[in-house]
């Protein structure tokens, strides 16, 4: 072989201008057999900044990727091993080139190059003022059309960001920023000092990790992929002839769309954007007093669209905040200047960006589709405008189909649901710590599926106010509890649910076209398993479900409807047939190309003609390679010779035998013992085979999209299947909770509001393995609608009133509750004022926050409300606190339709208000005098008893907090002095009143006696 130097492909571009004519004949590895289909642009090679990091070997082992022509074999006779750098002049030239290019301060990235140089001519070194390279020009064109996005562009086996995008991404990801032009339009004054754009890069295998980090910073990120391969570009007459590969945006991600549009395996159970929604919101103010809102909210993971129109006083915005809490917006589309600053601040506080988007003209067929959809749900014109706006916004993410399905639209507010306001959700620990331990959600959640968990969350957020629906859930719980141990059908179904993936999310991803093949396979497999399960138990279903006289039909109309509909839908779906079209072994294939090409079982797939045609062409090329191998065997006289692999189709020859090989054989690489070659014919055939492989991948991708469309055609039916399974999962979850010890079915009563319970317990505290003392609840017109509860600090007052509210909410969700017996009315809302905290962000003090909560309660309560008022007035002075509390109780006690109220206080004088609606209670305790303590210690009994208590026993709490005993004794003595002063002051006031009445001369003795009797004497 020739004595020319063998060099790595990393150096080829750096030295080619200095090489001799013989050296210039060297062929790039990317042009040889087995070159990868993803390549770098040639002009990207021109942008290399340094070759100093590249290793040049001078021993007998060749550099990876080196190739040499067989034409130089005569000069290699003295060397039976690989070639070496034995040319001193060449080394000097190489050193000069390395130094010169190092001075240009441009980063070396040639390790990504794979052969795009086939399509561009060699260019001379450029000055900083030279024109942009074709790749940079392509990047600029893309960015100028997508200024609102961060572009992450594939270049070889890396993804790169350029100019201002690179600055942003490098800062967030903490990766190196290579110097260059900092703005895409070259507006930065320093840009003239550079000839390429600044950039940062990361390996393609890290794309999913970095994407999630970028969108978490509220960035809109577009992933730009190569739209053609080197093989197609070379052999396809219809391919573009430009010097760079065509690149297109393949996906656009935001925080709202990443979870549902990502094709990656997402980490953990929490999926970004799982419960979040995208809003389109408009706000109009009438006469400066009333603000009217129109809202469309879409959750892409659940495939739910919520619509709402509501009014509230300008600057109030309480209803808006409730919707923000429930729907958790992550993006909000608004018209320019549509929202005032105080409303925009609500969204800023939750890191929700406002996107100013004007209305766009939609295509005629889209307008018609929206019109047809609206015929079924009857939205107002303002809501239809928002639907159109959201549709045009979704087009960018390929999620617009969700806006055209009428069955997924639902109103936010409903007459059959109660809405818990944010205060109640927080103070009652409904979702404390995201539903973690110690919350009501944690207590009730025994769901087996992700979609069941999300539905249970909706049930808890919106308890029922329709007693018929509540009773149906309670009947279902009783039925499933008795049936589950006697039915193989239910037992097996419950086991299947334990291993069921998120069917609803996968179904929506199938509709969006973003799901992976493995995900589709497991989705079809799971639905098919449900189909088989129902087929297997048809006799049981016929006996108990298909007739309303069956056991299930009699016990639970809700379960009867659920399973009757499930049985019908599962018996008609085509998904089991679609499952037979999949090649299971290909689904499990780790090689992504093989997974794509072999995904379909062509014996069952009904659109396989295009794939089969390309496969036949590929087989023809492989046959020709076999023929070529037979010729090579004859020439080398090695009848058992085989290609080294069926990718590169290389011929392996011992180094001692290479001198007799044909001149046109091309050496690809070598070891100390053997060299590997490709012949001109095998090279052409492998390139042709690569071309057909790329065609097959392209055709398989097209067929995969058609396959997803076939599944999507059953979207409405499949969604019903999933929602019915979710509802059953929720019933199972509530049944599991209801099986706890001493849980009882609530009884609902008509007439005036009442809660009557015997030995009721706080469900959350009890579930934390704390021994909880049960208490009775007596609230009704006869037993008092207003309960004023006094007692020592830490005596259990707040726990008791929370207990009443939690039992009410659990009962109206449709769950059994912890009590021996409970009878209650239906409540339309539960309003709370519990705890003390300020709002530093809004500049509100503790007392102002307290008063704002009271105002909210006064505006929203009615006769069917349950109010929890915990120590109102504690945020201000004692006299003001007493006055406000007194005024509140008097106000409610004089209402003709007074709601049920639980009022805890440390102001015992409030219990002296006279009203037939008021009952006084206190949390019981036992006093104990201990040695060395001036104050009375208290043993809490946590039992509710009638009557008032006049001491809060704050010293006892100070002791529990382990304050120094001397400090507590001093505090007690001061407290006693103040108490005596207060008693003396009251006595003086009484004496003064007596004196004034007795000295009055202008009234009769009878009137004097009446006034004396009216004095408040204790």
Curated annotation (Swiss-Prot):
Coiled coil: none annotated. Residues 21-82, 102-127 are annotated as: Disordered. PROSITE patterns: DNA_MISMATCH_REPAIR_2. InterPro entries: DNA_mismatch_repair_MutS-lik_N, DNA_mismatch_repair_MutS/MSH, DNA_mismatch_repair_MutS_C, DNA_mismatch_repair_MutS_clamp, DNA_mismatch_repair_MutS_core, DNA_mismatch_repair_MutS_N, DNA_mismatch_repair_MutS_sf, DNA_mmatch_repair_MutS_con_dom. The keyword ATP-binding applies. GO terms for biological process: DNA recombination; meiotic mismatch repair; mismatch repair; mitotic recombination; removal of nonhomologous ends; replication fork arrest. ATP binds at residues 791-798. Residues 64-82 have a biased composition (Low complexity). Disulfide bonds: none annotated. One of its GO terms (cellular component) is cytoplasm. One of its GO terms (molecular function) is double-stranded DNA binding. It is found in: Nucleus. Keywords: ATP-binding, DNA damage, DNA repair, DNA-binding, Nucleotide-binding, Nucleus. Residues 105-117 have a biased composition (Acidic residues). It holds the Pfam family MutS_III. The PIP box serves as a PCNA(POL30)-recognition and -binding motif. Heterodimer consisting of MSH2-MSH3 (MutS beta). Forms a ternary complex with either MutL alpha (MLH1-PMS1) or MutL beta (MLH1-MLH3). MutS beta interacts with proliferating cell nuclear antigen (PCNA/POL30). Interacts with SAW1. Component of the post-replicative DNA mismatch repair system (MMR). Heterodimerizes with MSH2 to form MutS beta, which binds to DNA mismatches thereby initiating DNA repair. MSH3 provides substrate-binding and substrate specificity to the complex. When bound, the MutS beta heterodimer bends the DNA helix and shields approximately 20 base pairs. Acts mainly to repair insertion-deletion loops (IDLs) from 2 to 13 nucleotides in size, but can also repair base-base and single insertion-deletion mismatches that occur during replication. Present with 736 molecules/cell in log phase SD medium. This is DNA mismatch repair protein MSH3. The lineage of its organism: Eukaryota, Fungi, Dikarya, Ascomycota, Saccharomycotina. The gene is MSH3.
